[in-house]
């Protein structure tokens, strides 16, 4: 474990954790556990849809992205669902989205919106398809970059530019706010 304030664990810390685990009494369960499959994506995607529809003031059956072409570059990471299970059902045309199937070898480009080749990939996708918007995710979908068409070219919104755009949206909704970021 590592934190910016406390730093990483020292050898003594790790030794203490291992000793604690070794000494812990793990009682035998009264009955045997079970293995199974649980669908976590459907409730997650439905929750995202509800948040989007609510934020846009739309009814549950509306398709607020109808008429918009939105391309996604998932970089063969976990973000492919975003195009097929979220944007498309909300009405977006996702034709031209790329690398939606997870592949841990990442054969197309590094799945990192801060990587120049990756950003070039989503910029090309927006230009080639005439998309209204492009979004690129990292491997585990906790970072993103965005692309907007502009006068025959594109504007890449990564790192601070994306934070600035989100801040502008939030200021309109909530008034003055404080934003803390480590995206520099």
Regions found by a protein language model. Give the residues of each.
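Gly/Ser/Thr-enriched, mixed-charge loops and adjacent short helices
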Residues: 1-129
């Amino acid at each position: 474990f590592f934190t910016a304030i406390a730093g990483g664990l020292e050898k003594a810390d790790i030794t203490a954790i291992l000793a604690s685990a070794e000494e812990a009494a793990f009682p035998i369960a009264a009955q045997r556990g079970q293995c199974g499959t649980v669908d976590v994506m459907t409730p997650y995607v439905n929750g995202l849809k509800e948040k989007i529809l609510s934020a846009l003031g739309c009814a549950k059956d509306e398709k607020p992205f109808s008429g918009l072409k939105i391309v996604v570059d998932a970089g063969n990471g976990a973000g492919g669902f975003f195009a097929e299970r979220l944007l498309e059902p909300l009405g977006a045309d996702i034709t031209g989205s790329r690398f939606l199937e997870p592949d841990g070898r990442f054969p197309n480009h590094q799945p990192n919106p801060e990587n120049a080749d990756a950003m070039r990939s989503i910029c090309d996708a927006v230009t080639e398809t005439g998309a209204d918007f492009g979004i690129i995710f990292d491997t585990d979908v906790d970072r993103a970059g965005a692309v907007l068409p502009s006068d025959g070219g594109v504007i890449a919104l990564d790192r601070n530019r994306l934070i600035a755009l989100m801040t502008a949206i939030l200021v309109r909704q909530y008034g003055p706010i404080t934003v803390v970021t480590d995206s520099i």
